[in-house]
Amino acid sequence: SPCFRKEVGAHGIEERGVYRIHQFEKQEMVVVCKPEDSKAWYEKLWQNTVDFFRSLDIPVRTLECCSGDLADLKVKSCDVEAWSPRQKKYFEVGSCSNLGDAQARRLGIRIRSKENPKELYFAHTLNNTVVAPPRMLIAFLENNLREDGSVAIPKPLQPYMGGMTELRKK
């Protein structure tokens, strides 16, 4: 989905370049489910992001947001952060949120009970930013860069790179 950031250029030197750009794309996962399934879906969505980055040999950690820091509507949220060897710190590369039934109430999204077809209840909604390519590119290059300037290609990407195992300047 296309995204636009208002505060471009409002931060320090560490956030120049592709880290904080005005317009970018990101790949989202959205789930609309029964209330009793939302906790399991939250775990699946979060795990998808963590597994994706780890498959690219990018170290990640997860920060659970405390209730006082949750944005409107969110019941639970966490940020996935990747390690930056250059900055020697983690930076945000994704987030996962469970909005409970709050968004469904605003949008009127209801589920009909199988047991009692006359009974309607509000769905739960969740979303997960799997990857924002500009930040993923930073994490990928920094964590796969070798001393000689070549970039290692992780095994899951090699079939899509014609079997290449590294990128090297000619």
Pin down the residues of each PLM region:
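TRNA-recognition modules of translation machinery and tRNA-sensing kinases, especially anticodon-binding
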Residues: 1-170
